[in-house]
Amino acid sequence: MSIEQLKDQIPDFAKDVRLNLSSMASDETLSPQAKYGLFVACAIATRNPMVMAAFEAVAAAQLSATALAAAKSAAAIMAMNNVYYRFVHLASNKEYATMPARLRMNVIANPGVDKADFELWSLAVSAINGCGTCIDAHEKVLQEAAVPAASIQTAVRFAAIIQSVAVAIEAAGVTVALAAE
């Protein structure tokens, strides 16, 4: 499935989402690896099979096998870290913040691709998953790596668009299912 075919699945009530998807696809703010890896990581974070399939198909033609695997790794490791660190942050009992996480996360130190790209993907997935602690940590690493604020903002904007595509498609499916009853 292509992005154009995915766009065709977005219902009219989400016209803005469709337009944002078109704009995102043609945006050249990020390098190709950063952009297409971000597409994959964020699509996985939506948990929508149609969105995942479309973005992986588009990205596979643009990314090396190593970069594609790293983007998937970013989504997987953030799925774990975002839950854990969001809990630590939100729990009233601050003792948890002093305890070792005891979670393996070696891929963050050695992602197999440019570290800034991996951090950008991790930040975007953390935005989708709503982990403020992870957002702050990844944004700090990106600032230290001299990644421009415009690139960071673009990554989060893309995450928001990809998430909205998944929600619009799911909402359309519910509408169709209810109409059939």
Curated annotation (Swiss-Prot):
The lineage of its organism: Bacteria, Pseudomonadati, Pseudomonadota, Alphaproteobacteria, Hyphomicrobiales. It comes from Bradyrhizobium sp. (strain ORS 278). GO terms for biological process: cell redox homeostasis; response to oxidative stress. The keyword Electron transport does not apply. The keyword Oxidoreductase applies. It comes from the Bacteria. The active site is at 131 (proton donor), 134 (cysteine sulfenic acid (-soh) intermediate). Belongs to the AhpD family. Antioxidant protein with alkyl hydroperoxidase activity. Required for the reduction of the AhpC active site cysteine residues and for the regeneration of the AhpC enzyme activity. Its EC number is 1.11.1.28. It catalyses: N(6)-[(R)-dihydrolipoyl]-L-lysyl-[lipoyl-carrier protein] + a hydroperoxide = N(6)-[(R)-lipoyl]-L-lysyl-[lipoyl-carrier protein] + an alcohol + H2O. Gene3D superfamilies: AhpD-like (1.20.1290.10). One of its GO terms (molecular function) is alkyl hydroperoxide reductase activity. This is Alkyl hydroperoxide reductase AhpD. HAMAP family: AhpD. The gene is ahpD. PANTHER family: ALKYL HYDROPEROXIDE REDUCTASE AHPD (PTHR33930:SF7). Disulfide bonds join 131-134. SUPFAM superfamilies: AhpD-like. InterPro entries: AhpD, AhpD-like, AhpD_core, CMD-like. Keywords: Antioxidant, Disulfide bond, Oxidoreductase, Peroxidase, Redox-active center.
